[in-house]
Amino acid sequence: MRHLDVDGLGAVSRVGLGTWQFGSREWGYGDAYASGEAKAIVRRARELGVTLFDTAEVYGFGRSERILGEALGEERAEVVVATKVFPVAPFPPVVRNRLAGSARRLELDRLPLYQVHQPNPVVPDTVTMPGMRQLLDAGRIGAVGVSNYSLARWQAADAALGRPVVSNQVHFSLAAPSALDDLVPFAEREGRMVMAYSPLAQGLLGGRYGVDDRPGGVRAANPLFGTENLRRAEPLLGVLREVAAAHGVAAAQIALAWLVSLPRVVVIPGASSVAQVEANAAAADIDLRPDEQAALTAAARAFRPVSAVRTLVERVRERLPV
């Protein structure tokens, strides 16, 4: 497992584990998964050298944090647990209380990374960050991060905190590569960390799905799985399969390897099984050749998915009688 050194956090594994599905019924995993498989996944992740575990107070209404804390057991203080505060009325007393709730569920006295879950469209970071700074100065958290922030908003958060905001967790994959344009260069220049969530585009980059084989459940509503977008994704998926075949690994592993080959980027894929977390962790050690990296990047930039509105119209038309 490869690592990234981050101020306030130390060594962070380049492949982490996202736990949004822990305790979330909409993913269809259910209570049996939460009480059994989820804990086995966390234990195996630790055995494989994973040190970064991401969660949030809103995932499963706190159940994700609770399940993760229990699964980590005595090792919970030895890893980088990253959780998030949802910025509703994010005044300092509220932020302190929300941190206390997360810490209690995770069974931690000190949280390594505390993130603002998304930018509040009305309340500026000059309101949110004083509470985060108080927690930082008091030693209740190791570092401050943000999520879903533009570069300009990330820099504004820096100024409001008066200290570096060490990370920005964003939607980032071969199917959504916009972070390449500004967030990754900023992170490289300033020594920050970009955390890529949904790095496999909800399974699209695994190469399993196509026009005649689409996912069910909550992913069925994702515009990426519309007919036109699946057609447009084929050139990207073709390059992905070609590189995967050259390395003798799965397409999903190449999609992760491309991300972790980028400067200052870590990935936090979820896992529905122990086998999946093993495959994800192995991706950290895949060395892509420069020409393979370039081909994947070019294919990612060339992918232009149609909008959610167009996909909705397309789906309505597909259901109309001919």
Feature-to-residue mapping (PLM):
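Beta/alpha (TIM)-barrel catalytic core signal, keyed to glycine-rich beta->alpha loops juxtaposed to Asp/Glu
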Residues: 3, 119, 123-322
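Conserved beta-strand positions
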Residues: 17, 55, 83, 113-116, ...
